Amino acid sequence: LRGLSPNHVLVLVNGKRRHETANINVSGGLQSGSTGVDLDTIPLAAIERIEVLRDGASAQYGSDAIAGVINVILKSADHGGRLAYDNGRYGDGDGLTQNGGVNGGLRFGESGFLNLSAQFREQARTIRAGIDQRTGHYGNPSIGDPSLHRQALAYNAGVALDDNVELYSFATYTHRSVSSAQIYQLPSLAPRLYPNGFTPRITSDEDDYSLTLGARGGELFGAWDWDLSSTYGADRPEIGMDHSINLALYGETGDSPRSFDLARYKATQWTNNLDLRRDFDLAWLPAPLNFSWGLEQRRELYEVEAGDPWSYYNGGSKALPGQAPATAGQWSRDVLGAYLDLSTALDERWQLETAARYEHYSDFGSTTNGKLASRYRFSPEVSARASLSSGFRAPSLAQENYTSLGVSPTIASGLLAVNSPAARLLGAEDLEPEKSISYNLGLVLDPLPDLNLAIDAYRIEIRDRIVDGATYSGQPAIDALRAGGISIPAGLTQVSTHYMTNGADTRTHGLDLTASYLTRLGEWGRIDWRLGANVNRTKLVRNHRGRNGQPLLNDQQQAWITRSTPRSQVSLQADWSYRRWGLTLRETRYSKTVSELDYYTGEHAYSTTVFNRFENSPKYITDVALRYAASRNLTLSAGANNLFDVKPDKLPAESAYLGFNQYDTYASQISFNGAFYYLGAAYTF
C-alpha cells in the first residue's frame, strides 16, 4: 500500500491480527528484508470480501499499520455453497496452473452456523532465461517461477448461547510444497557425480495454520458490548536442497550427498484481546459519545533449527548452504498493549474521532501513538475527511536474527543477523522501532446518482526505517562471515555481506483516486465502470551513517526505496452485463521505474559502489474475462491476464548475469512470465 514495504501493512482476519511468515525476503528490491503476512495461506474459497483501510492505524491496532490495514472477512453463510475450478497456462506454453475450491455453509441449532472451505493449487514451473554464456544454450531454469503444490482448509463458525452471548471460532490451515531451480552448474564441477552438470533445487515443505476462539456479546454491566478472543498462528517451513553437492566433501572423499536438509524455521504468534464499547449520552454533546477501549497480550517466537552437518560443512551445499549451529536459535518476546478510541458527531454534519494506544515490548521498551480524524458532510453529494496520526513498526524477530548465505557460480552474498558477532564486527547496532507521522486529506463526491468519486492526498514520514543495507565486500566481508561461524566455498572471486539496519528516514507523499459509474443500456444490459489511480513518490530524507562514517545505503539500495515502484499507476475497468453474458475489460498503465544494477563485466564488475542505471519503460497491460451463465447454477468463463503478452524490458548485456538473467527482478512493474490464458467453471448450490 502507498509504495511502502509489506511490513508496513497490518493484516487482520475477521478483525484479528494475522501472524507473519517465517520466510524473510532476501532477494533484493523494496521488499528485501520484509517478513509480512503471506495472504496465499488464506484459501480464496473462504473469503467473502477484503476491506482496505488506506490510513495509518497504529493508534488503533498497534505495530505495522503505518501504510494501512487489510481486513480479510471470511464467509459466514449457513446454507448453500460454491464449487469452482480454473485451468490455464502462459503464452510461452509453460506454467500450467490449476485452481480448485469448494465452499459450503451449514446451519446447526436455531442460531449456529458452520462455513467450510477447501482449496488446491497446482502450478508447473516457468523458464524465462536468455542464452547462458557458459554453454551457448537457452533454458537456465533459475529464471522463472517455481513449481508449487498447495492445499488449504478453512472454517468459520458461530453460535448464540442467548440474546447477549455468542461463541465464535475460525481457522485456516495450508500445506505448500515448492521446488525452485537454481543456477545450472557445469559438468566440470563434479564430473563423477554429475557428468552432464546439475541444477540444484531448493525445496520448501511448509505448514501454516491459525486458530481463533472467542466470545462476544452485549449488556455487560448493563451497557457494554464486549469481545474476548484468543488467536494462535504459526508458519513452519522446512527447507531442503536436491540435486546439489558439497564440493569440499567431494574434493576430500570423491563423494557427497546429493540432497540436504538445510534448515527448519518457525514463527508463531499468540494474541489475546479484550475489547469493550458503549455509548454515553452527555448533555454537552449533541450525539452519543462512542467509547471503546481494549487490552492486548501477544507472545511472538522465531526459531531456526540447523540443517544436517554436510549442508553447512566447509562451504556447505552448492547454491544455498544450510544453517549451522552458530546461526540457529530461538528468540521470543512479549507485547502488552492498551488502547482508547472516542468518536462522536458534533452536529449532523461533523464527525470527530480520536484514539491512543500504548504498547510495551519486552525487548526494546514502550511506545505511545495517537490519531485524530474528522469527517464533514458539506451536502449529500460532498464530504471531506482528514486525519493525523503517529505510528510505529517493531522490527520482526526474523529481521533481528536471520542469517543466510547465497552462492552462485562466482558470487557469495550473506545476510548477517544484526545482533550476531559477524554483524557487530562490521559495526551493526541493535534495531530500533520505526516511527511515523501520517497526514491524510480527502474528498468524497457523489455528483450524480450513479457516479461516486473519492480523492485522498497523503504524506507519510518514517524515521529509522528498517532496510537491508550496510553492504561490505572483500576481506571485511570474509572476516565477518568467518566470525559468524559461516564457511565460504572455495574458488569464489566475489564475497559480500549486508545486514538489516535503521538506515533511512523517508518521506512518501501521493494521491489516490477511485471512481465508479454505472451506464444503463436498457435492453442491452449495463456497464459498471471503475477507475483507480495512484500517484506516489518516496524521497530519502536522510541516509544514516555507520560507525565508520560511511552511508549505510549505497546507490542501489537507495533506488530500491525511492524508484523501484511506479510513481503512477492508472487502471480503468469496464464490466458489461447482458442477459446471460458478461464481459470484463481492464487496462492498466504503470509508469517507468529505475534500477541501479550490478555490473558483471568491465572495469566496474561486482562493484558495491558503482552501478549501472537502468530504466524500465512504462507498461500497458490488458486483461479480459468473458463469462456465460449456462444455467441458473453453472457459470463458464474464459479470459486472459496480460492479453498482449507484454514483458519487462531486457537488461543490458553488462548487467545480465552470465547472459541468462534477462530481466530486472528488483524493479520491473510486471511479471516476466507474460500472457496467461485460462478457462474456468463455477457451480453454486
Name every feature range the model reports, one short phrase each.
Residues 12, 38-40, 52, 64-86, ...:
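N-terminal periplasmic accessory domains that precede
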Residues 16-54:
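Short acidic/polar hinge/loop motifs at secondary-structure boundaries
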Residues 22, 234-238, 243, 299-316, ...:
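Surface-exposed extracellular loop regions of Gram-negative outer-membrane beta-barrel proteins
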Residues 79-82, 92-182, 187-196, 200-218, ...:
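Transmembrane beta-barrel wall of Gram-negative outer-membrane proteins
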Residues 150, 206-208, 326-335, 381, ...:
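Outer-membrane beta-barrel signature, preferentially recognizing the C-terminal barrel domain
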Residues 198-212, 219-221, 232, 242-352, ...:
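Outer-membrane beta-barrel transmembrane domain signature of Gram-negative proteins
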Residues 452, 457-463, 467-599:
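Gram-negative outer-membrane beta-barrel transporters
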Residues 537, 587-601, 627-685:
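C-terminal beta-signal and adjacent terminal beta-strands/loops
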